[in-house]
């Protein structure tokens, strides 16, 4: 573990990146970034694990590694992550992204956005070794979200250095149950993996990587680690950086695309946040899902006021803040834009859920208020009837939608049906075969979009504003 501690001074804080120490060889073949969402219950050690992976240090058992990556003051003080944040490991030109998400149930909508809107390839479920997995706990909810979105995941068991043997045995039984329910083969990595010829990965591990990537054999690796003692930390880091992204595997023909129509799509960049930078202007951050985007390219941004406005790309930065000329498929970054459409536009008009594309007609055709879908209701306390409203999470979209059912039709838990859903606020860009989630209170479910009605052929619902109740104050009688 001395190599871990030595590299602290070499990493620095520049761009929040940790490098493997190998030179970046630009002549190497282009390899897209692998993205992992880091999930798990509160106090499981997610941020500490990400801090150890990113900074190449060991934790002191009192939140030191976590404090190095905390974004806000209250996160440093309380240790509770309330926002999603991305952290990067650069290894010989390949970028591995760790997306640290919230573990508290209060911030579940932020976690759902991270899973659906940040286009991750794999998941890391962090479980504290000295805790129990409750059937209705947050960890099980996160696992169900990953399974619903067809995202393979690795289970990382932290705090293994302070775990009693009986608790670990009980935890393994829970993992066996989860694997059998998901029809996955479980693989345990308990003992400390030794380095051999400069690598912690052996032939048996390569078989694991291949089965994890091609998804023909469904596996659920469970790795025991300790952020404090360094147990299996180097092994996990090398394993994560060795697994290739889904985009790279599709390009190589090793796996089939989830959506067969994706080859016919134009360039699409999904926006997950926007900024107004003094001296620069509007900056949009997001992921290029299809095609590529270049500096100087003239594109369309929207939907903005039910249309798409003309923009020009002035500058591009990749996910590690490097100034680049191009963002390729599956790469995340930010673009500085110039608005070419005349009009009055404010920063508030550019939000998550919008897209940047080079095909105006394609964008208008797929911008809808209403869409047809097939849904499955996982949980609901009573019955769902016509007009039921819930929040739809689809890629970077997060907007209330209203169910359109027949008057005599009702849905209950474990129901599956086809229906129309209508957005209540504004039209959104949606594509067929997209997976979406809906959640509201104790209601949970998912669906697959089958098609939409272009908003120019549809009419928005009229939202009735509720009158504010004014409490009448009785007049005081003035005595004579």
From Swiss-Prot:
User: Which residues does the annotated region (G5) include?
Assistant: 226-228
Q: What name does this protein carry?
A: Putative GTP-binding protein R624
GO molecular function ontology, one term from the record: GTPase activity
Q: Where is this region: G4?
A: 158-161
Family per similarity comment: Belongs to the TRAFAC class translation factor GTPase superfamily. Classic translation factor GTPase family. GTPBP1 subfamily.
Region of interest called G2, as start-end residue ranges on this chain: 79-83
Per UniProt, which keywords does this protein have? GTP-binding, Nucleotide-binding
> What are the boundaries of the region G3?
100-103
Q: Where does GTP bind?
A: 40-47, 100-104, 158-161
According to its UniProt record, what is one Pfam family this protein matches? GTP_EFTU
Naturally occurring in which organism (per UniProt): Acanthamoeba polyphaga mimivirus (APMV)
InterPro entries hit by this protein: EF-Tu_GTPase, P-loop_NTPase, T_Tr_GTP-bd_dom, Transl_B-barrel_sf, Transl_elong_EF1A/Init_IF2_C
Q: Where is this region: G1?
A: 40-47
Q: Where is the tr-type G domain?
A: 31-248
């Amino acid at each position: 573990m001395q190599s871990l501690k030595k590299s602290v001074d070499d990493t620095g804080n520049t761009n929040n990146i940790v490098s493997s120490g190998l030179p970046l060889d630009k002549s190497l073949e282009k390899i897209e970034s692998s993205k992992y969402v880091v999930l798990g219950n509160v106090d499981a050690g997610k941020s500490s694990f990400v801090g150890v992976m990113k900074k190449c240090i060991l934790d002191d058992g009192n939140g030191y590694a976590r404090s190095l990556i905390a974004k806000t003051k209250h996160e440093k003080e309380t240790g509770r992550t309330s926002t999603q944040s991305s952290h990067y490991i650069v290894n010989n030109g390949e970028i591995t992204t760790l997306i640290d998400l919230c573990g508290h149930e209060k911030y579940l909508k932020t976690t759902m956005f991270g899973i659906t809107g940040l286009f991750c390839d794999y998941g890391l479920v962090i479980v504290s070794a000295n805790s129990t997995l409750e059937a209705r706990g947050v960890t099980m909810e996160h696992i169900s979200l990953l399974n619903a979105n067809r995202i393979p995941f690795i289970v990382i068991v932290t705090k293994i250095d302070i775990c009693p043997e009986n608790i670990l045995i009980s935890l393994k039984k829970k993992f066996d149950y989860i694997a059998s329910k998901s029809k996955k083969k479980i693989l345990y990595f308990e003992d400390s993996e030794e380095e051999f010829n400069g690598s912690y990965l052996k032939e048996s591990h390569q078989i694991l990587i291949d089965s994890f990537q091609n998804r023909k054999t469904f596996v659920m690796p469970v790795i025991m680690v300790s952020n404090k003692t360094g147990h299996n930390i180097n092994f996990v880091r090398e394993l994560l950086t060795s697994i290739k992204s889904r985009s790279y595997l599709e390009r190589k023909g090793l796996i089939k695309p989830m959506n067969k129509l994706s080859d016919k799509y134009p360039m699409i960049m999904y926006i997950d946040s926007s900024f107004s930078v003094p001296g620069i202007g509007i900056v949009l951050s997001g992921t290029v899902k299809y095609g590529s985007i270049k500096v100087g390219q003239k594109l369309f941004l929207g939907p903005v006021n039910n249309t798409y406005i003309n923009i020009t790309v002035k500058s591009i930065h990749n996910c590690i803040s490097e100034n680049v000329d191009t963002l390729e498929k599956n790469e995340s970054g930010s673009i500085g834009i110039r608005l070419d459409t005349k009009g009055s536009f404010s920063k508030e008009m550019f939000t998550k859920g919008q897209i940047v594309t080079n095909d105006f007609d394609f964008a208008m055709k797929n911008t809808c208020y209403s869409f047809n879908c097939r849904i499955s209701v996982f949980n609901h306390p009573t019955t769902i009837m016509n007009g039921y409203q819930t929040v739809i999470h689809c890629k970077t979209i997060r907007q209330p939608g209203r169910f359109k059912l027949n008057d005599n039709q009702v849905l209950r838990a474990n129901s599956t049906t086809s229906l129309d859903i209508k957005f209540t606020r504004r039209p959104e860009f949606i594509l067929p075969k997209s997976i979406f989630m809906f959640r509201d209170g104790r209601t949970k479910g998912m669906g697959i979009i089958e098609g939409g009605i272009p908003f120019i052929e549809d009419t928005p619902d009229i939202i009735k504003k509720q009158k504010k109740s004014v409490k009448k104050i009785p007049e005081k009688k003035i005595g004579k």
